């Protein structure tokens, strides 16, 4: 009976951890929206620098999005390929 309880606790903690990992995806979304807004403001002020501004914004958003992708991968691992259940035996 103790093993069933242990697996239940591990699975519940993994679900909570996956939820926390997905909450971490909020940060990149807010940051990307802020960066896009500032890029639009910059293009409105200096239309001749549009190419440089857009390329810099896209590079920054690609780097910021990697955080969201990592949190998604961690959540999927915790939910579907949980390494901690195998440690219980």
From Swiss-Prot:
Keywords: ATP synthesis, Cell membrane, CF(0), Hydrogen ion transport, Ion transport, Lipid-binding, Membrane, Sodium, Sodium transport, Transmembrane, Transmembrane helix, Transport. GO terms for cellular component: plasma membrane; proton-transporting ATP synthase complex; proton-transporting two-sector ATPase complex, proton-transporting domain. It is found in: Cell membrane. It comes from the Bacteria. PROSITE patterns: ATPASE_C. Pfam families: ATP-synt_C. InterPro entries: ATP_synth_csu_bac/chlpt, ATP_synth_F0_csu, ATP_synth_F0_csu_DDCD_BS, ATPase_proteolipid_c-like_dom, F/V-ATP_Csub_sf. One of its GO terms (biological process) is sodium ion transport. HAMAP family: ATP_synth_c_bact. F-type ATPases have 2 components, F(1) - the catalytic core - and F(0) - the membrane sodium channel. F(1) has five subunits: alpha(3), beta(3), gamma(1), delta(1), epsilon(1). F(0) has three main subunits: a(1), b(2) and c(10-14). The alpha and beta chains form an alternating ring which encloses part of the gamma chain. F(1) is attached to F(0) by a central stalk formed by the gamma and epsilon chains, while a peripheral stalk is formed by the delta and b chains. F(1)F(0) ATP synthase produces ATP from ADP in the presence of a proton or sodium gradient. F-type ATPases consist of two structural domains, F(1) containing the extramembraneous catalytic core and F(0) containing the membrane sodium channel, linked together by a central stalk and a peripheral stalk. During catalysis, ATP synthesis in the catalytic domain of F(1) is coupled via a rotary mechanism of the central stalk subunits to sodium translocation. This is ATP synthase subunit c, sodium ion specific. It comes from Propionigenium modestum.
């Amino acid at each position: 009976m103790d093993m069933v309880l242990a697996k239940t606790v591990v699975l519940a903690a993994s679900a909570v951890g996956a939820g926390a990992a997905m909450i971490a995806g909020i940060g990149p979304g807010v940051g990307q929206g802020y960066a896009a807004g500032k890029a639009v403001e910059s293009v409105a002020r200096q239309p001749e620098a549009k190419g440089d501004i857009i390329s810099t914004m896209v590079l920054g958003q690609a780097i910021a999005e990697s955080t969201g992708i990592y949190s998604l991968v961690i959540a999927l691992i915790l939910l579907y390929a949980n390494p901690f259940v195998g440690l219980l035996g």
